[in-house]
């Protein structure tokens, strides 16, 4: 039985920052026709709110603006609730709570509420820490979890990039906390056929 190919890609904040740091955001656009790239409102807010202070935030904002026809920014209940309060006072104000898991929760919320059928369309969520793997209850059954490092390895195997190691090295040189050895490639748990993501990316579709 053939596995279900991914039709929706949603990166968390960590992968966006790392790919920006490694000048590799364009890899997210190497998608075959019919595959959507989505950012939740809170993840986008989280990575760009201080774009005037951090180069990666400015890079992400410019990237999204340049490719707005190919990137969807979707509203979520998390973003609707949290963003206005944070905008009123800076994040570095200790009196303003900013839980670390709001981005992940916004992704989980979007995937869960946007389903037209069960278990839902095969969805790839790019991650960079163990929040999703440690909170299985928050992972919708149609979600395939993939870490940044595993993503780069897969793109190399698919011929989209020449060297995953070079991009990882570029990321780590500017982002020492990047976890090169955090490798996760976990299929969706409630799609009986299983899920695959590599075929959803093509070397011919990479942006320039």
Language-model features: locations:
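Acidic catalytic patch
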Residues: 69-97
């Amino acid at each position: 039985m053939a596995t279900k190919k991914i039709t929706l890609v949603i990166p968390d904040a960590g992968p966006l920052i790392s790919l920006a740091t490694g000048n590799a955001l364009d890899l997210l656009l190497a998608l075959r026709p019919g595959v959507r790239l989505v950012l939740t409102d809170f993840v986008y807010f989280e990575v760009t709110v201080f774009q005037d202070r951090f180069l990666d935030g400015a890079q992400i904002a410019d990237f999204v603006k340049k490719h707005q026809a190919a990137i969807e920014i979707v509203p979520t209940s998390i973003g609707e609730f949290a963003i206005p309060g944070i905008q009123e006072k800076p994040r570095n104000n200790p009196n303003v709570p900013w839980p670390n898991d709001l981005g992940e929760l916004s992704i989980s919320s979007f995937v869960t509420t946007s389903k037209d059928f069960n278990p839902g369309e095969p969805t790839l969520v790019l991650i960079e820490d163990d929040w999703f793997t440690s909170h299985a209850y928050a992972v919708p059954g149609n979600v395939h979890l993939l870490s940044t490092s595993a993503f780069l390895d897969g793109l190399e195997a698919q011929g989209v990039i020449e060297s995953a190691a070079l991009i990882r090295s570029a990321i780590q040189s500017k982002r020492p906390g990047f976890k090169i050895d955090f490798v996760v490639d976990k299929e969706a748990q409630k799609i009986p056929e299983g899920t695959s993501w590599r075929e959803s990316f093509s070397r011919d579709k990479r942006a320039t």
